[in-house]
């Protein structure tokens, strides 16, 4: 079997295609969430705490020197990334809950006791007397 044929069989399998679609949609969803956080969520929060732009929040660790930029601890960008993560985590958790609820089969009614179980129950009840 040629390598090209093996690869084609591998790539066409359902799991690989599903995973590829998931990765592409996940990347697009991540961009949407990043835009939501940086363009919609963070500006009002920054405005509420005194007109702060979170992108610019940083602490200078070492000043700029000739030929080198200042070393900055950009904690504002980190805060935005935390918001990104939380929104994505909540969305994924919600989707997993819905999918699990759909996949979960309706619980079957308890099975009728077998003849042996009925007999053992009668014996137990007689011994209790």
From Swiss-Prot:
Record-linked SUPFAM superfamilies: Gated mechanosensitive channel (SSF81330)
Keywords per UniProt: Cell inner membrane, Cell membrane, Ion channel, Ion transport, Membrane, Transmembrane, Transmembrane helix, Transport
Membrane-spanning intervals of the chain: 10-30, 76-96
Record bears the keyword Metal-binding: no
Membrane-topology annotation of the record: Multi-pass membrane protein
GO terms of molecular function: mechanosensitive monoatomic ion channel activity
Annotated signal peptide: none
Subcellular location field: Cell inner membrane
Function (record text): Channel that opens in response to stretch forces in the membrane lipid bilayer. May participate in the regulation of osmotic pressure changes within the cell.
Subunit structure: Homopentamer.
Protein's UniProt name: Large-conductance mechanosensitive channel
Species the sequence originates in: Actinobacillus pleuropneumoniae serotype 5b (strain L20)
